[in-house]
């Protein structure tokens, strides 16, 4: 019975404080009540742009009730046990910051550019009501840039054969593909992994670069995939020389027929070695 009464009182308090979400919002400031991203292109999901938001409102259970904020609002200004407890289990109100809003707008626009929408426009609109503010980021994608022609400038034949795929439908870079930074980077990672699997352990995606020609017109891009040579320091320390990438190969294989991994002493024992040339 006591538990039910406590639960009832707590529910009443939560209901009462939920009606005053701006209780701890300083005068002249606004509670960030809602943030929304609207994109005019169905190919770009608004959820993919949320990671670029620099400020988001307080969490709301089921998107309706802000319980953490409600708990925080149950605290008063005095420094006592009750107020400290409610502030600990709750979260303070998110105060609207115009600087963070502008940073979010810029980051969203950069993200759109990376997705191939170089001419995208992003605006941040605000609506104020009763010391609460709603921010809406309106994204106008405009015409995206797409790949027109893709060529591979790989002068090393031992590597160029591993950059192509048997099934052309699996190519990430092909005519009509969005000039998307993430797709371009995925192709670099694919080539690097393929070469690593072939023994080029020192190879990484940084050796793959792109040259893009956007003068084709009609929002088309001619793309060239380039291979950078491998740098090696000169023995005299005066600089570096560039050489071809080389795969690692197995030189010698040794078989220890009576080796016992459980015997610690054997790990440091010199064994007789017989060499065989096949």
Locations of regions flagged by a protein language model:
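Bacterial N-terminal signal peptides
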Residues: 8-16
